[in-house]
Each structure stands twice: as structure tokens, then as C-alpha cells.
Amino acid sequence: MSAVGNILSMIKSLSAAEKRELKMMLLENASATMSDMESFMTDERFAGGMVCPHCGCLHVVRNGHQESNGKQRYLCRDCGKSFDITSNSIVSGTHKGLDVWERYIACMMQGLSLRKTAEICEIHRNTAFNWRHKILDALQDIEDNVVLNGIVEADETFFAISYKGNHSNGGSFTMPRKPHKRGKEIHTRGLSKEQVCVACAVNRSGKSIGKVSNLGRISTKNVDGVLGDRIDENSTLVTDEMNAYVKFALNRGINLVQVKGGKSKKGIYNVQRVNSYHSSLSKFMRGFNGVATKYLNGYLAWHNFMKYSKHTDAERKQLLLRRVLTLPKKVVCKEISNRDALAFAV
């Protein structure tokens, strides 16, 4: 047996506590050097040559090094702006080496708490929070390009509206209702405006869409706002008997099959996959002890990436590194906490 085989056999004999301890030790020692990550970022972001991240032009020259950290800087001869390899990305202006970001992503992949992640990455808890939402914002941009084809099942699920995190916004936030007592459930009957509707769709190859659509009962306009242009016109849409989908499918020219309430299927069609998606999403969200509604879309994208993408954990980590860190998107920390309490049209 190889050395790796011997190690794997030994790991199987460890207790649950010992396995957790080993995982923490590996995470703390698995990060690449800063120079390795800078080379990685340069290769991934500028594989075809140096391009200005501000205007996209190719007329770029070297422009010395940054005094604080020694990073190579560049100057665009067209727009006159200077930049480094991280400019106009989510890691821009974070004042941490890219090796710390790799360690952070490893913690995120393991589902570690912000407190534990901050400890391992040697950053403040507030920084860990902001980094999470920078990554989730970039992940949303990627997930928004997912288009479903084949047999697509669609249905809604609901979360209680949460104004968590809005009360400290410099007095600019006013609660639109009386606060609920801790641990008390919402007592409004039916699908009230206290319920956040999440429109969901899953196809049989495992691709998924999940996004906040509205408050209360979903309408055709709400369905189109989430699923419009994201379901191939040659697909078959399978739903329950909700009327909102009838007009949506008609307007989009999509074949619609509706399964009657109380029935598990209609021929080869059913809504079992989207129901399973709801269960998976509910379990995933419980791990965060309440998510503010203004951040909900980010967690939906995270769930889809982790649970409904056919990749190994190692492949997911590489995808996050290659696509999320290099995505041309800048997120300012102050903007994260100051987002609207309801990040969608009510």
C-alpha cells in the first residue's frame, strides 16, 4: 500500500473529534505563498496579455511597484489609469495577500463559521463577514448566467422576512412594522407580505436557479423576473397548479405541464426534484442562524454552487479561485452593510 493509502486508512480509524482537529490543522497549513497566488492571479486574469481592467484596452506598460507591498503596477496609455493585478476585482483594496484569500475560500468550502474562519485566516470578524459577501456577490453574477433546458421543475419556497443587520445603519433605517419577539413565530395567516418568496427551478441534469422574487404570493410578473430568459424555449416546464406559470409559459412559448395538487406525478413528469431542492435549501439555511433578507440572494447562489453543481470539493475551490477572485467586479465594504433592507421591488 502507498504512503497516501496508509494515511487514508489511519484517518478512517480516527474519532469524529480527531478528524475535526486534523481538518483544522490541514486548513491552517494548506495556503499557498503570496508570490504563488500573485502568479496564479496574473495567469488566470491576464492569460492573453495585460489588459486594462478599467477600459479593456491593451496599450499597457509597467509603472513601478507599490511601496506598501511591492506589487507591480501598470499604466494604461489609453485611459491614463494605473492598476495592479487585483484592480477592479473583489480582492481590490483588501490589504491582504492573495494567499489569505485562498485560505479563506478553503474555510468557506468547509462551511466554517465566520468566527473560526477569522481565527484561521488571522483577520477580524468584520473582515470575514465582508469577504463572504464579496464572494457571494461575485458568485451571484456567475449563477445569474445559468440557463435550464430539458425537463425543468419549478416551484416557490418561502422565508420569513428578516431586517437583521439594518438597525445599525446610522439611524437611517426605520422598521416598517413592530419587531417580533425573539423566538416567536409570525402569526399572520396565509402568504402575507411577511413572507419572502423565492422562485426556484431545477432540471434533470442537476442545474438550478433560486432567487428572491417578491413578498407574498408569486405573480406572472414575478416568475418572469426570475425565470424569464433562463429557461430554454425548447424545454418542458413542470409546475403545480399555480396560475402564474400558465401565462408565463404562454408568453415565453414554453411547453407547460401542471401536476395537480395531491398527485405525485403526471406521466413521466413530477415536481419531486424541486421539492428536494427546497428541503436541501432549508437545511442549508438553518446552518446560518438567520440570514437578513437583503443578503438572501447571495446565500441562494452559494447553496446552488455547493449543492447543485456536479463538481468535487477540490474542483469547486478551483472554480472559486479562477472565476470569483478574477471576475471584473469591485465590491466596497461600506456598500455591503448599507444595502436596502429589501433588495428587490416589493
Q: What residue spans do the PLM features occupy?
A:
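Residue-level recognition of single "structural anchor" positions
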Residues: 1-346
